[in-house]
Amino acid sequence: MMSLLFYAPLFSYEVKEWDRKKKALLSRINRSEFGYYGLNDFQTDRHSKKNRYSLDFEGIFSEELEEFKKEANLEYLRVMDIWTLKYTKKTENHCPHNHRSIGYTGLMYLEYDDKV
């Protein structure tokens, strides 16, 4: 007998006015505060004291977050934490992992090389 071990829905959205919103978010990311931490094989601003753009993210992407809130049937939605990863070598990666059984996790590719 086969049964489902867990259910993992995927919500995917096309961002309206992507160029403007991308530029707005990139302007809030302090690129000088990236570093390697612990065993991580990527650079991040996760541990930077200047990483305080979750409210900016909510404002910039309010339409898309509202769409997600309705589709996920949520009464309340708040971005609790946000950080950026930066890969500069082909060997850098972020391994699959989970964030416990509460809440949602989002992923956005701001800049990438579509040839890789």
Model feature map: region roles:
Residues 7-9, 78-80, 102-104:
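Residues at beta-strand starts and edge strands
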Residues 1-76, 93:
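Non-heme Fe(II)/2-oxoglutarate
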Residues 74-86:
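A short glycine-rich, His/Asp/Glu-containing loop-to-beta-strand
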Residues 84-116:
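Catalytic core of non-heme Fe(II) oxygenases with the double-stranded beta-helix
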Residues 1-2, 80, 108:
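Detector for methionine-enriched segments
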Residues 58, 62, 81-84, 103:
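Generic internal hydrophobic packing segments that stabilize the cores of diverse globular domains
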